[in-house]
């Protein structure tokens, strides 16, 4: 008979936040509630699931975007959850990661409200046209209430913020004000259709907000239900296409090229090509690794809406488009900090240079 219709919804979702808003705690809570991890770590105990880089663990901040995989509604929705760097000085990687997202979850600390860094992230999401959900965290601590925070969001970031934790009548009234199509249905006295709400979110007319406390696991289930209910997969091209968004190294020093598939299918051992006209590269995709935290499984093929780390591609650069996918433009966020390297006494300069080259490869400015 005909091939079975693949009804799995595959999404790449990135979590972005101001540095102390509880982003890693939310990621942990999400993975815990989705069943990916059995116990909760805490950033302050330095065993958080997504922060696998030793440099990060020592400093308690997230530098390299990590990812975790989980499923919702009985496997019908598969999510690659990318933790984007929260420090603006790691902005080129954050920007490239945002460029491969289907949806973003922006985490805001309720007591702190909208920070100037929140506005920077919002501008980045707007420029990349990423539909965005908000999780307003730390609502268990003293601070402004929901209405005051929604007012602040609208004042500082613009229209479209709707409390999805409100009762349906209040939510629908707020939704109608954000989108003409929803307004027409609302004025006609019709219940708002899920599909129309999904479309309004995809068009960035509506930004659903949930309020809660990641640490207390409050509001996390509602966010996950929202990710399953109010999303749709990106249209996928028929021919193979993928976007490289970062390059890193595994523990053994093997080069990993991270890409998001946008069309067709990527099969293990496929030959990929890229680089500028006339000076291009061609290489075999040795392994297709699906990472969740520090662990990975090997895939035979990777489909649109999935992210994988490929070994064997020595020359692929972050931002590069493969197959039918075109290259991303240059990152627009200028790094805020410049760095000077001071080597401790007795350091072998050659080893240090090799390590600096590795960092330069991973962050091609």
Over which residues does each language-model region extend?
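Residue-level signature of catalytic and energy-coupling elements of molecular machines
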Residues: 20, 26, 60, 81-83, ...
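Flexible glycine-/small-residue-rich
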Residues: 15-17, 67, 72, 83, ...
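Conserved nucleotide-binding/hydrolysis modules and their immediate coupling elements
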Residues: 230-232, 237-339, 353
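P-loop NTPase switch module centered on the Walker A-proximal segment
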Residues: 3-108, 114, 129, 155-157, ...
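Short amphipathic alpha-helix segments
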Residues: 346-361
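Short, exposed interaction patches on small structured surface elements
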Residues: 160-167, 171-176, 323-338, 342
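P-loop NTPase catalytic nucleotide-binding module
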Residues: 2-21, 39-40, 110-251, 271-272, ...
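Active-site phosphate-binding and catalytic loops of NTP-dependent enzymes
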Residues: 5-6, 36-45, 50-65, 90, ...
